[in-house]
From Swiss-Prot:
This enzyme's EC code(s): 3.1.13.-
Keyword match Repressor: no
Stated name of the protein: Ribonuclease T
Keywords: Exonuclease, Hydrolase, Magnesium, Metal-binding, Nuclease, tRNA processing
Active-site residues annotated for this sequence: 181
CDD domains according to UniProt: RNaseT
Cofactor remark: Binds two Mg(2+) per subunit. The active form of the enzyme binds two Mg(2+) ions in its active site. The first Mg(2+) forms only one salt bridge with the protein.
Organism: Photorhabdus laumondii subsp. laumondii (strain DSM 15139 / CIP 105565 / TT01)
GO molecular function: 3'-5' exonuclease activity; magnesium ion binding; nucleic acid binding; RNA exonuclease activity, producing 5'-phosphomonoesters
Residues noted as binding Mg(2+) 1 in the record, renumbered to the chain: 23
Job description of the protein: Trims short 3' overhangs of a variety of RNA species, leaving a one or two nucleotide 3' overhang. Responsible for the end-turnover of tRNA: specifically removes the terminal AMP residue from uncharged tRNA (tRNA-C-C-A). Also appears to be involved in tRNA biosynthesis.
Amino acid sequence: MSDKKAPNVLSGRFRGYYPVVIDVETGGFNAKTDALLEIAAVTLEMDGEGWLTPGESLHFHIEPFEGANLEPAALEFTGIDPLNPLRGAVSEYEALHAIFKMVRKGIKNNHCNRAIIVAHNANFDHSFVMAATERTGLKRNPFHPFATFDTAALGGLVLGQTILAKACITAGIPFDNNQAHSALYDTDRTAELFCEMVNRWKQLGGWPLTTTAEKTG
């Protein structure tokens, strides 16, 4: 078995955290009152040389919880019709239960301690996941209660861009604005972007960390 703290294994790269890319589409900005309408999750994998790539994915359309607020402006922005039967929507419980199961399996297989949400403007997605978890009464939430990796902040640092589409294009990742604001597409692009930035930092010599003795020779 490889050393769990080795720099080129997933558990050693992010201090025991298992990064999972999440995107949500919603009926507004308030995680407590507004509907969670769509969610996608992509796990990440690391090869033997320490390069990060997207892994497994799950995607669900979600039924608004009872009494959920649906802001017309938010629905116009996402293009989601919550009442369309062709959405094949499931309950918040069903969607999160499946995602949590996938994530817990990844944590175990990669010898990590806990999952951490990777998202673009991550506080938004994190707040909706946490609120839905509380509403459904789901136990054993695998995600850290407040820590996240925000690709908007990382994109500003690495690429000089904070908008997802512009950050992707700057990084050489194709981005189709016609598919944007679909949770599945945005999660896929965010996963590619996060992997590109992590791998670029490694390529530039920023990882593995150099010890003081190695620096001074």
